[in-house]
A protein has these predicted regions:
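Pair of pore-lining "gating" transmembrane helices in MFS-fold secondary transporters
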Residues: 24-64
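Helix-breaking motifs and short loop linkers at transmembrane-helix boundaries and internal kinks
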Residues: 102, 123-128
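Central cavity-lining transmembrane alpha-helices of secondary-active solute carriers
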Residues: 77-95
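Glycine-rich segments within core transmembrane alpha-helices of 12-TM secondary carriers
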Residues: 165-188, 213
């Protein structure tokens, strides 16, 4: 009878409480407060670090690559299209890899790729190089897109999963608002300290989110639950 009760209790997803009582969030066995805080930390930075790559492109097109204004719209569209194709083509493989090797290396790897991508992007000297760097960055997009819902699914019991998704997506939006605007405002500052050199300004500007992404990657590598989901 006791075993039957334990089985029913596990299926109903009681779990351990986490966070404010009003949220009524409960986490799965083996998941600690540290793991949950790391999930929320990664959620805050995800959308902002993915979105800034689009925000920086007009400056790169105009000031670094000297792309004519009439060609910038089609170029931006092509970059987005190719990026989405790569995401669609790889996201299933990434999910399968995370089932085998764990969420931690994949999600931390996503932000490491973002970091390297932001270092490379302003170094592009041709549209072809920029496209190659954007496709490399898109691999990180696929990894981040796949891992956030996967980690949520692993960490919350079934009854709390919807609420945790809402919290994480709220942090996504909050991070987008609080991070993207300050990053945009850094460009005039960097233009000032390099005496108006657009190439150097672009590099310093994009290397700022590169540093942020490296810190996030390190935090995820330290704080997420180790092992594959079954472990």
């Amino acid at each position: 009878m006791n075993r039957l009760n334990e089985s029913v209790e596990g299926a109903s997803g009681v779990g351990e409480p986490f966070g404010p009582r009003k949220l009524n969030l409960r986490i799965a066995p083996g998941v600690t407060t540290g793991h949950m805080m790391t999930l929320l930390f990664g959620s805050f930075f995800g959308i902002a670090m993915m979105g800034f790559i689009n925000a920086c492109q007009p400056y790169l097109f105009t000031e670094v690559l000297n792309v004519p204004t009439a060609e910038q719209g089609p170029l931006a569209g092509n970059l987005t299209f190719l990026s989405e194709i790569l995401v669609v083509a790889t996201i299933g493989i990434i999910g399968a890899m995370s089932d085998k090797f764990g969420r931690k290396p994949i999600w931390a790897g996503a932000f490491l790729i973002f970091s390297i991508g932001y270092v490379l992007y302003p170094l592009a000297q041709t549209v072809e190089q920029l496209t190659a760097f954007r496709l490399f960055f898109a691999l990180g997009l696929a990894m981040n897109t796949a891992m956030l819902p996967s980690v949520i699914n692993d960490y919350a019991v079934e009854a709390s999963r919807g609420r945790l998704i809402s919290v994480c997506f709220m942090l996504n939006g909050l991070g987008f608002i609080l991070l993207l605007t300050p990053l945009r405002l850094l460009l005039p500052y960097f233009e000032g300290i390099v005496d108006g050199d657009p190439v150097l300004a672009a590099r310093y500007w994009l290397w700022t989110p590169a540093a942020v992404c490296l810190l996030v990657s390190t935090g995820l590598l330290i704080g997420l639950k180790p092992g594959a989901p079954a472990q």
